Amino acid sequence: MRNRGIEYGIQKTNFNEVLSIAAISEHDWINLESIVPESQSVELNISCPNLDVHEDTTIFNGFDAWPTIYRKWCIVKVPPTASYSLLDKIVKLGFTQIHASNTLPTDKGGLSGAILLPHTRRIIRYLKREYDHVEVIAGGGIKEAWHAEFYKDLGADHFSIGTACFNPFKVWRTVNEINGDPSIGVHQT
């Protein structure tokens, strides 16, 4: 599903929101970096399974230019199948915020939900063991507050709720439960 493009995305994204972008071809990171304001928080999706190409876009020119002190958020959204060497590479390039994880690639697109739990758990454990300074955003199967609590106990700093969004009544109940549970310590950005 294609969107309306980067200019439209920038126009519709408030200064305190995160703009999610992906590179499709080799020079996209360079082109996007020259267009996106330096102060705009971004999430770099390096693994969108809905694209025709399934490759590691961190090898594309300009990926390493994104980390900056001017952005509050410069998140890399990794695939659930991310290798430890890919995670090492991302951190060594200067990224300190990682979203684990994207949807699981299938022949028919990306699969989300509870199937991501073991993948997200593996990524959180590795990052917190090897790079405790990295902020981890955990996602995958969060439908109830206890799912966020599970990820928090593994070391997640923030949470991404996608699965619950398929039911608008469920998502608000889940967000309110998470925000109302002081043991989880969730804050909205």
Describe these PLM feature segments.
Residues D107-L117, K152-T189:
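C-terminal helical cap(s) of enzyme catalytic domains, especially alpha/beta-barrels
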Residues M1-T57:
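Active-site beta->alpha loop and helix N-cap motifs at the rims of alpha/beta catalytic domains
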Residues I21-A23, I46-C48, V76-P80, N102, ...:
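A cross-domain feature marking catalytic cores of carbohydrate-active enzymes
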Residues H27-V36, T81-L93, R125-Y131, I142-I161:
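Catalytic cores of alpha/beta
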Residues I10-N14, D64-R71, V91, I124-D132, ...:
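Surface-exposed amphipathic alpha-helices with a cationic face
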Residues V42, I98, F159-S160:
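Hydrophobic residues within beta-strands of alpha/beta enzymes
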Residues I46-I59, P80, S85-V134, P168-T174:
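Glycine/Thr-rich beta-alpha phosphate-binding loop at enzyme active sites
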Residues F15-L19, I69-A82, L127-G139:
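Short beta-strand/loop segments at the ligand-binding rim of alpha/beta enzyme cores
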